[in-house]
Amino acid sequence: MRKILPMMMMVVTPVVGMAQNRSGLNEKDLDRSVRPQDDFYEFADGGWQKLNPLPPSRSRFGTFDQLQDNNNKRINTILTGLEKKHYSKGTIEQKLADFYKLALDVNRRNQEGLAPVEPVLKEIEAAGTIEDLRRLQLKYASRGLGMQFDDDFDADQKNAAMNILNIGQDGLTLGEKDYYINNDSATVAIRNAYRLFIDKMFRLYGFNAEEAAQRRDAVFRQETLVALISRSMTDLRDPESNYHKMTLKQFDADYPDIPLKEITGAEGIRPEYIQTVVVGQPEFMSGLDKLITLQTPEDIKALMEWSVIENSADYLTDTIREAQFDFFGKTMRGRKVDDPLWKRATNQVQDQMGEVLGRIYVKRYFPESSKKYMEELVHNLQVSLGQRIDAQTWMSDTTKAAAHQKLDKFLIKIGYPNKWKDYSKLNIDPSRSYYDNVVACRLFHHNQDIEEKAGKPVDRDEWLMTPQTVNAYYNPTTNEICFPAGILQYPYFDPKADAAFNYGGIGVVIGHEMTHGFDDQGRQYDANGNMKNWWTASDASNFKKRAQLYAKYFDHIEVLPGLYENGELTLGENLADHGGLQVSFNAYKQATAKHPLKTIDGFTPDQRFFLAFAGVWADNITNKEIRNRVKQDPHSLGRWRVDGALPHIDAFYKAWNVKPGDKMFLPENQRLQLW
């Protein structure tokens, strides 16, 4: 864990080694036909949108995706280099090269047809009774065939130093319950298309028309019943209401028809590790407990077979994979064509062996100097957030002291892990099918999780993203912020650009992740990562009142005719966006106070800060993807992460001379502020 100096000893320092004569901005990204005071997103990103039309293989394409594409090309260079050589069996190079070759070999997959999944499908068909099918589910428990709830080891949110078995709702192929129960025309169209898709997939897997129709109806009926007892994405955001700790004895009493001990035992989990568990959604488990008793053998068969289909469709013939893409890519998201083979293959290797690929990636592409710059930026943002906490008049000194304690104990991860996962037990066998090897990878990760987490303390060195990922995160149970090497590149971070650009780009990202520790979810966890109330009643009430204003504000943003942002679902991300802006701007001003920056390319330093921020969220997106994200993405759309945030930032008004009558203008008494 990084040692943090006490707050009173911390000072903001300039980021050394950064040039002061480059703006980092690209004039072509701007649309000067738009007044920044009326639509800052369009002014800052309109040119980028024109220069980067939506590729037919994408439903959304933004600067995040652009950078991830560049990283994927680098990863592909690594893999093609490995592919050309021979390696001893069992080496990580052999595993990467052989898996990549399998992912590329579409001719072999087309020749094999359904052979990789026929044995398990025949087993399911041969099972004649419910008892036979339940035994078969136990045999394949590690693959979750037909299981309608999720179980995995993760931190106990009220004893965050230890792992515990967490049990929660699952069983919806479409992810969000609204797809099954809402009756607006767009949702009904998706629902009808989903039924046709289920039918088509069963036929492609060898079932005749009558069998496919029967299984389609069973799957859709069962998933709809599960949707009716499921919580919405918004309801899943409340940590306290999704935490119910109980003994195994109590679980068995409450849900007598869910044989947890038998299921987990079949997964390889010893009984002593499940004597106490956490149930996320008790009403879901109660509903499922009743639903299970009503299932017929045909229902169970259909669910198990559907699990096989959905778990294998991307790894079998072109015809099957294309049918999968037609629904999830085209119908659900508005993509026109699938990614090229090299990209799909590269992504599959990353999905299964991403961290070991990341180890090669950082050696080749991540300069240690970038890590040094980031450490200083993070330090400065940490100081700034402490100052922002002190400046809040709605908080008591008692709560501020606890907030500082939490801020001081942030675990900071930059670039890549200090220790790497061990892949020695993973066997990649090129004589077996691509799908068989994917299953081997999944079982390896499943078993590794059990081995490393069941009954054991939380490993604070574990990374939840690979180093090459273009993203960042805050984890409340370890109180950590993580910035993988993948995001530490242009247009978020440029060691040759001045502080205005870097604080507006990666600085806001850092501030965003830090603010997550104090958003509506993060504030419920203490300095040690435990879900524990450290707020006075008055301060908690003040926080909730202010946060609710953000939810209401975003509820009124119309993203498509008749479709609005979900302010409750996106609340945490919106609070983090606004807090990140405030914290990073404050840090930037202090870091440059003794060495003021110059106007470059016609823009003042403060203007460049906000242009860099807006550039982070430049994108093009389909209407279908907008609808999909509004239903289940906790992030607001890119446009509104800019135009929804900046009207509340006082410094933005000064930098861009925003006045009454301008479309970006909000009266001071309507500007929201939390951090």
Segments predicted by a language model, with ranges:
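Short secondary-structure subsegments characteristic of cysteine-rich extracellular domains
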Residues: 57-79, 212-229, 502-508, 601, ...
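Hydrophobic/aromatic-rich, well-ordered segments within soluble, folded domains that form packed cores
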Residues: 29-50, 180, 184-204, 571, ...
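Short, Gly/Pro- and small/polar-rich lid/capping loops
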Residues: 20-28
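Active-site-surrounding "flap" and adjacent substrate/cofactor-binding loops of secreted or lumenal enzymes
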Residues: 35-38, 43-108
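Structural recognition of the beta-strand scaffold that forms the well-ordered cores
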Residues: 39-43, 164-166, 480-484, 517
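Bacterial Sec-dependent N-terminal signal peptides
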Residues: 1-20
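Noncatalytic, helix-rich "gating/capping" subdomain that lines the substrate-entry/channel surface
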Residues: 82-376, 380
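Intrinsically disordered, low-complexity linker/terminal regions across diverse proteins
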Residues: 68, 219, 254-258, 278-282, ...
